[in-house]
Amino acid sequence: MSKIEISNDTRIIRHRTPARISHWMLVICFFMTMFTGVAFFFPDFAWLTEILGTPQIARAIHPFTGILMFFAFIYLALLYWDHNIPEKNDIRWAKGVIEVLKGNEHAVADNGKYNLGQKMLFWTLNLAMVTLLVTGIIMWRQYFSHYFSIPVLRIAILLHSASAFMLFTGILVHIYMAFWVKGSIRGIVEGWVTVRWAKKHHPRWYREEVLSKLEEDLLNEQSGKVGKTKVLFKGFGK
């Protein structure tokens, strides 16, 4: 039983500022790395290198934006890995995936902070990112490629290309799902979601990790206490 009445329109923190900054840095680096990578792999798209000035500049920048992308991702991975460990409760989501696609996720699954689909994507992107980093270093002509034999370089190129495709596909799915689930974009842009959204899409996260902290924040607010809240979103800079 809740200690205090909580409106479904109450705003709660979904992603804090450091995570959102890292996420959008990752987005920028992803597109810069993707555009240059596609241009190198497919000659018909060589014009994409002109976005950064010249093909030479694009080739020089590509590995560095890739490394920045990797570290931005790793920060997020370390921040959220414990929320992405598969658990027995995820089986309900898998069995009810058709209902999930119909928009009835709340009727078949009791999700924590992330559902099974998000967890699968998380670990897929981890695999792709690590493979891209390792193979990219092997292929980096200016510094490292001369240390490796031609067969190793060929395998690295093949794995790099496959991992890039895996990453690109995963990001497309991520973008589509973010727009498909209304309210998700706001969570990563502004950092907050409503209690209604949390109850519908991630009810166990709301019950186990948010509710008690939210009650405390609201009680403090009612009693006139000021300061940093735990989960209650009070606006930027507050």
Curated annotation (Swiss-Prot):
Membrane-topology descriptor: Multi-pass membrane protein
High-level lineage: Bacteria, Pseudomonadati, Pseudomonadota, Gammaproteobacteria, Pasteurellales
One cellular component (GO) term of this entry: plasma membrane
Cofactor detail note: Binds 2 heme groups per subunit. Heme 1 is located at the cytoplasmic interface, heme 2 is located at the periplasmic interface. Electrons are transferred from the periplasmic to the cytoplasmic heme.
A GO molecular-function annotation: formate dehydrogenase (NAD+) activity
Matching PANTHER family: FORMATE DEHYDROGENASE, NITRATE-INDUCIBLE, CYTOCHROME B556 FDN SUBUNIT, FORMATE DEHYDROGENASE, NITRATE-INDUCIBLE, CYTOCHROME B556(FDN) SUBUNIT
Keywords, sorted A to Z: Cell membrane, Electron transport, Heme, Iron, Membrane, Metal-binding, Transmembrane, Transmembrane helix, Transport
One GO term of the biological process aspect: anaerobic respiration
Origin superkingdom: Bacteria
Binding residue positions for heme b 2: 62, 160
Protein source organism: Haemophilus influenzae (strain ATCC 51907 / DSM 11121 / KW20 / Rd)
NCBIfam families associated with the record: formate-DH-gamm
SUPFAM superfamilies from the UniProt entry: Transmembrane di-heme cytochromes
InterPro entries found in the cross-reference section: Cyt_b561_bac/Ni-Hgenase, Di-haem_cyt_TM, FDH_cytochrome_b556_subunit, Formate_DH_gsu
Gene: fdxI
Subunit structure: Formate dehydrogenase is a membrane-bound complex, formed by subunits alpha, beta and gamma.
Residues that hold heme b 1 according to the record: 23, 174
Protein's UniProt name: Formate dehydrogenase, cytochrome b556 subunit
Pfam families: Ni_hydr_CYTB
Function: Allows to use formate as major electron donor during anaerobic respiration. Subunit gamma is probably the cytochrome b556(FDO) component of the formate dehydrogenase.
Protein family according to the UniProt entry: Belongs to the formate dehydrogenase gamma subunit family.
Protein localization: Cell membrane
Bilayer-crossing regions: 23-43, 60-80, 120-140, 155-175
Cofactor(s) demanded: heme
